[in-house]
């Protein structure tokens, strides 16, 4: 409020962020998929290509914010065409891997962000722009679903007789039935219909006329995949690198604090 910020840019991580805000009026919200200034009227959020998006979490949190009086939360949110998507099956694999580790677990948030980063780094990411061609989307979702089922089946096989075998099977059953391709497709159609005309390219959107931009990360520096302490790290860069890369693309000569 004091800086008259008009744009908040998310530049790393995904919906595992948990940024608690309390307004002077007593409104409370824990932000995960939106910029933490959205309780301030007029402030915009930009989800850059450096952030990963869970359409489910985005839609759910948006409805919660609307119930708290932020009725235009979706209208004030803009998304990069090239944001990678965190699917429920990334979440399935992430949860099952952490269960398999048992006492050697890493402390994962188990939301699938790390698994989606792996796919993005390997050039296999499902991107926001891929959600708008429905026939192609069904094909891509089916490919991801089958690939993650194979990974999950391997975890189940390795874990037969283990203390977490029943939990692993229950996790697999839920994500392959309740979160099947048809259910996820319907949810993603709702997401794409809602945000379609507000999807943009990083450099075009960030080159706009803004007074003050805040770049909001998702984790602390000691979780950075290069500078943190393995294995207790996230899979993405948590320092200023992504923010600087975005600025270098679009706002040469900008004053940085």
Tell me the role of every PLM-derived stretch.
Residues 1-257:
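Non-transmembrane, aqueous-exposed alpha-helical and coiled segments at domain scale
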């Amino acid at each position: 409020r004091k800086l008259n910020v008009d744009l908040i840019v998310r530049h790393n991580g995904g919906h595992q962020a948990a940024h608690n805000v309390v307004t002077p009026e007593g409104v409370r919200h824990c932000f995960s998929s939106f910029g933490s200034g959205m309780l301030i009227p007029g402030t915009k959020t930009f989800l850059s290509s450096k952030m990963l998006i869970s359409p489910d979490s985005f839609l759910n949190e948006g409805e919660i914010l609307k119930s708290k009086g932020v009725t235009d939360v979706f209208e004030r949110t803009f998304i990069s065409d090239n944001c990678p998507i965190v699917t429920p099956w990334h979440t399935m694999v992430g949860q099952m891997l952490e269960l398999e580790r048992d006492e050697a677990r890493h402390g994962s948030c188990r939301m699938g962000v790390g698994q989606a980063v792996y796919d993005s780094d390997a050039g296999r990411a499902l991107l926001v722009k891929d959600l708008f061609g429905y026939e192609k989307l069904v094909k891509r979702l089916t490919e991801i679903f089958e690939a993650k089922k194979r990974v999950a089946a391997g975890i189940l096989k390795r874990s037969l007789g283990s203390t977490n075998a029943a939990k692993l099977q229950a996790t697999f059953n839920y994500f392959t039935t309740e979160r099947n391709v048809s259910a996820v497709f319907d949810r993603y159609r709702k997401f794409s219909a809602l945000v379609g005309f507000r999807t943009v390219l990083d450099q075009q959107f960030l080159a706009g006329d803004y007074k003050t931009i805040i770049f909001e990360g998702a984790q602390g520096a000691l979780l950075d995949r290069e500078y943190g302490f393995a294995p207790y790290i996230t899979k993405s860069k948590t320092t200023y690198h992504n923010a600087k890369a975005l600025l270098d693309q679009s706002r040469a000569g900008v004053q940085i604090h």
